[in-house]
Structure formats: C-alpha cells, structure tokens
Amino acid sequence: MSKGINSRKVAVIGTGFVGSSSAFALMESGLFTEMVLIDADKNRAEGEALDISHGLPFARPMKIAAGDYDDIVDAAIIVVTAGAGQKPRETRLDLVKKNVAIFKSIIPEIAKRNCEGILLIVANPVDILTQVAVKLSGFPENRVFGSGTTLDSARLKYLLGEHLQVDARSVHAWIIGEHGDSEIVAWSSANVSGVPISEFCEMRGYTKHDEHMEEIAQGVKNSAYKIIEKKKATYYGVAMAVRRICEAIIRDEKSVLPVSSIQHDTYGIEGVTLSMPAIVGKDGIEKQVKIKLNEKEQEALKKSAGALKKVLADLDI
C-alpha cells in the first residue's frame, strides 16, 4: 500500500441498498476511522452518512461524511456499488449496458485523481464491470477486482451447513466462474474440515448425494432471484462479503477468497474476468490460486468464460 494512502480510510461510491448496507457493515467492522459516501444524489449520501453516524456511540469512533471524488484520493479502498439494481426475472447480464454507461462516468473520475487505493467493484454484472473498470482506470490488475462469487460461496456454505447439520464455517467449498447463471460449484474440491463432501454426506446418512448436491447448487444460483422476488433487492449478504474482503485487505491477511479478476492461463482461459480463488492482502490480489477441477468443472468454467467473453465483445469500451 502506497505511503500516500490512509490505510484506515474507505470510500463507498453509490448509496443505494447495497452501498448503504456495505457502509453500515464497514462502520461496525472497526477497520476504519474515516468513511466517505458518494452518490449522484448528494442528499441521499448525506442522509445515509447521518443515519450511520448516529450509531457510532454504540460502536467505535470514526468520521463518516458525504463527499465528492476529491475526498477519495487517499482512501485505502474504494468500494463501487453504484449502478442500476436487478429487477425481478432480470439476469445480472441484462444490466450490462445500463451499468457500463454509469461506470463510464465514475471510473474516469477516480482515475484522473491518480488514486492509489484498491478499487473493489460490487455493482452487477460484477465480472463485466470489473473488466470495464480495469480498462477505464488504467490501474494495475491487482488493484482492481470484484466481489465476485464471495457471496455465492457463502450461500453455498450456508446451504451445505444446513443440509449436513454442521457449522457453515467448517464447510470449505467454492463457487467459481461468473457471478451469475453460469456459475459453477467446484464439488471436486469441496470438503468439511478436510473430509471430502461426498464422504461427509454418507457419514451423516445421506445416500442420494448427486441429487442433493444438484438441489443445493440450484438453491445457490436461484438465491438472488428468490430474494428479489420477495423483497425487491439483495443487500445484507453482499454487505458482509464486502466487509470480509476489506478485512483481508486492511489486515493484510493474505486470505484466499473467490474474487473476480482478469484470468491468465487458468485452464486455458486468458484475458477474461471471472471468479477464482485468489490470495488477497494489502496490495490487493497477490496471486491467483489454481484449484484442482475435474474435467466436467473445467469445461463448465470455459463455458462460463465464453459467455462473459461474448458480452465483452459487444461492449463499446
């Protein structure tokens, strides 16, 4: 992290449901002493800053304020949540053109100020927008990445924990590829405290392993659609994912997280942004981790990359 960076300062661009929930989660985390909220609707940003600030007597001292792009120059992390929200029955990829247009107004503002912090993309479709952000900012790839399938992987762990009646924190499993309809469960590497998932299922008395696993995979994939159908938007889960990623950066944890970044020679995939586990620390992505995948998973990953590549080819960036 650069000397010109305040390692205890974070900026959140976009104060809709996801941005404000992320800001609240970051306030509670104790990771930062300063937070700037930016939104095209300045009144909304000011209102969120005030509302969250009123909870500070129950947390830790910090400065929270609405601001503009000049206020983010020394931020250690710039979280970008701004964008149109996903509507019922709308896929994340349906949001592409609307949110690319929004990013064309946001990312150049960050770039022209020579910000040296980490750019964490959260807006959807996160894989496409992360690649757009890399191109528009000109920043090194390690400093620009997306929340990716961090939330999807948490959903997978939660559902597996419920199914197997075990603490979700003991479940180690990844969702990889697109944060969207072509995402893949890396079942071949999934385990519960070192015990392969299929063996653990048998140990818990579940014999219809394939059937249950397919049901859980679909449950993860449909989670967002189900929530949006019921309450119009998802925001608490992703806010916790944002907090977790920021924690790994600020504490230089070198944690392995399934974030979205441009892939290089990942099972033959080159130059496409999607989620794979990566080591995350104070300088962003330190190294991509190539986990073992079986042939079926490798083919599904290539198919996911192909779908994203097709969308990218149609964009004017």
Give, region by region, the residue ranges found by the protein language model.
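A short, basic/flexible loop-to-alpha-helix module at the beginning of a structural domain
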Residues: M1-R8
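Conserved S-adenosyl-L-methionine
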Residues: E28-E34, G138-P140
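C-terminal substrate-binding/catalytic lobe of Rossmann-fold NAD(P)-dependent dehydrogenases
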Residues: S137-R143, D152-I317
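Glycine-rich Rossmann-fold phosphate-binding loop(s) that bind the pyrophosphate
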Residues: T15-G16
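Conserved N-terminal Rossmann-fold NAD(P) cofactor-binding segment
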Residues: E34, I38-A76, E90, K309-I317
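N-terminal Rossmann-fold NAD(P) dinucleotide-binding loop
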Residues: G19-S20
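Rossmann-like NAD(P)-binding element
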Residues: P57-I118
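Rossmann-like NAD(P)(H) cofactor-binding subdomain of soluble oxidoreductases
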Residues: T91-K157
